[in-house]
Each structure stands twice: as C-alpha cells, then as structure tokens.
C-alpha cells in the first residue's frame, strides 16, 4: 500500500541506461501515495491482467497519470493463462483511455505481452522470448528522458519521507534542476512559502533494492537526502542564493472521517501498552509526517481526535498499525 522505488541499469547498444521504477498502490484509498510519487515519473507502465482486463482501481491511477501528461506503455501480463484474452484486453484499455479523455499521444500506446511467472516479455504475442528485455526496450524507446538542466540553480522536490533511528528523517524525491552535493548548504521552501536553512549530510541513490551513498546528484536523478531535519512532503530543496519553489504536491481531500478516542469502557487499561490520549496524539502526529492524504483535527474533548482519510481501507490499516 506504500509507493516504493528502485533503480536498474539496462544496456542499450553497450551503453548503460539507468531506469528508475516506482511502484504505486492501485487502490483509490491510497491515492495520496499515487499523487505524490507521480511527480517523480516521466512515463508509466499500465499493467493489466490478460483475463481480468482493466480493474476499477485502474481508472483512478491511470486518470492521475494522464493529468500529468504521462504516456502509458501497456503491459498485458499472464498471457500464458489458458483463458487469456489479450487482444480484447488491449481494446478495453483503449476504450478506458478514451473515456478518461486521453490525448492522441497516449492513445497510440505501445503494447508488451508478458508472463511474470515464467519471466518473459515480447512485442509479438505469437513469439515467446526468454527474458524481460522487451519491457525495458519499450521504456527506453517510448519514455522521453527527463528534461533537466544541471547548469541551473538547484531545485529538488521531496515527495516521500523515511525514518531511520540513527540519522532521523530522510527526504526522498527528485532533482529537477542543478546539482546537489554532500555537505552542501540548502534552503528548504515549505508548502506555505516560508524558508528554512539546512545542510545535506548524506545523499543516497537507489540501486536495485539498496541505497548507495554518492557524492552528488544532478538534474533528473532520484535520491534520498539525510540531514534535512525539518523537511516535509511537498517541500522544495533549493539553492540558498536563488531559492525558487517548485509546484507543490496536490492531493485530493479525504472522503470520510472517524472519531479516535481512548478506551473508556470498564475493560480499559487491561490490554495494550499505549492507552493515554497523549500517546494517541503523538502516534497520529507521526502518521501525518508521511501520510499526505490524512487529516487530524481535535474532537469535542481533549481526548478525542477526528481522523479523516480516503476510505475504510486506509483508516482500517491505520487502526491495525496502531
């Protein structure tokens, strides 16, 4: 349910090409995850089942991608199933794109057929291959590289947060312009326009499932930044001599609200370690640090909190994790 990203290197004509891959949740309840990380992307892979076709949640995520002008590469998975109907599914995807008002460049989408279980992908459904090369070739061919200028003043957008008990808060995002180096002084521009001075203590880049320390990143790179203690989702990390904010992350408003309060039944305090209103408040405040789609407001009394989210599933998972 959380967006994750990785990076792989693919050889094209003997030249290594770095491809950053961001996996987003499909359910509309976690739309906040989708909306904030789509700002990192230059294109999208629309993964559909060769039997089920586009699902209801496909419409939500695809609509958000089209709003940002991302061109889809359609990947039809599970074509090895005996009941697969790959060609019909491609037509259903086209109809969905038309319904969502996609532009002409999105309607002329390339199609890759694959079997994730057997580990192969192909442009021609009648030709079975032995690897997933066709997907990476489609990405390099169809998705334009980032339009980024490393000579301009630094601009980077933070779209998600991580936390490490040793280094504290870690801001994850993309450099849109300029170059950022380890030890560099930067200005953090908050969503409300205020600025905070800070220092980049460490820069991490993604390599497979690992994070690798690097000395610098330039325009177009995705990275994780250590040392920016006051950074939040949607903040711009900019050069101190020319701090210009990037458009912040827009997230749709919550659709339902639930009342959270301490257990005041006759069985209160008999189980559970964190049972006071102060502890509940601290936990909800911690959730707000990385969950941009959630809102918390005080209730009628000091031990009540009105928690708003996208749906029953997102609030239910919050309750389980608490």
Language-model segments: residues:
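Structural and coupling elements of P-loop NTPases
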Residues: 1-322
């Amino acid at each position: 349910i959380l967006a994750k990203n990785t990076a792989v290197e693919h050889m094209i004509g003997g030249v290594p090409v770095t491809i950053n891959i961001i996996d987003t949740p499909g359910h509309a309840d976690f739309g906040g995850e989708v909306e904030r990380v789509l700002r990192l992307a230059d294109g999208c892979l629309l993964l559909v089942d060769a039997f089920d076709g586009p699902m209801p949640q496909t419409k939500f995520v695809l609509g958000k991608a089209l709003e940002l002008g991302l061109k889809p590469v359609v990947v039809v998975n599970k074509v090895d199933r005996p009941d697969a109907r790959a060609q019909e599914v491609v037509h259903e995807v086209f109809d969905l794109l038309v319904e969502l008002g996609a532009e002409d460049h999105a309607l002329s989408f390339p199609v890759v057929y694959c079997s994730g279980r057997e580990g192969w992908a192909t442009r021609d459904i009648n030709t079975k291959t032995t690897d997933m090369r066709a997907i990476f070739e489609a990405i390099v061919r169809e998705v334009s590289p980032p339009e980024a200028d490393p000579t301009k003043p630094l601009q980077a957008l933070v779209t998600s947060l991580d936390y490490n008990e040793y280094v504290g808060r870690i801001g994850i995002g993309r450099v849109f312009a300029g170059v950022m180096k380890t030890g560099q002084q930067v200005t953090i521009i908050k969503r409300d326009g205020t600025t905070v001075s800070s220092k980049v203590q460490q820069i991490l880049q993604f390599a497979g499932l690992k994070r690798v320390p690097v000395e610098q990143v330039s325009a177009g790179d995705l990275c994780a930044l250590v040392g920016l203690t006051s950074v939040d989702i949607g903040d711009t990390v900019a050069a101190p001599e020319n701090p210009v904010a990037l458009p912040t992350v827009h997230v749709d408003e919550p659709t339902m609200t639930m009342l959270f309060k301490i257990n005041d039944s006759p069985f209160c305090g008999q189980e559970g370690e964190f049972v006071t209103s102060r502890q509940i408040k601290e936990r909800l405040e911690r959730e707000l640090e990385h969950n941009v789609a959630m809102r918390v407001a005080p209730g009628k009394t000091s031990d009540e909190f009105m928690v708003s989210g996208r749906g029953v599933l997102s609030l239910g998972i919050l309750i389980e994790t608490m």
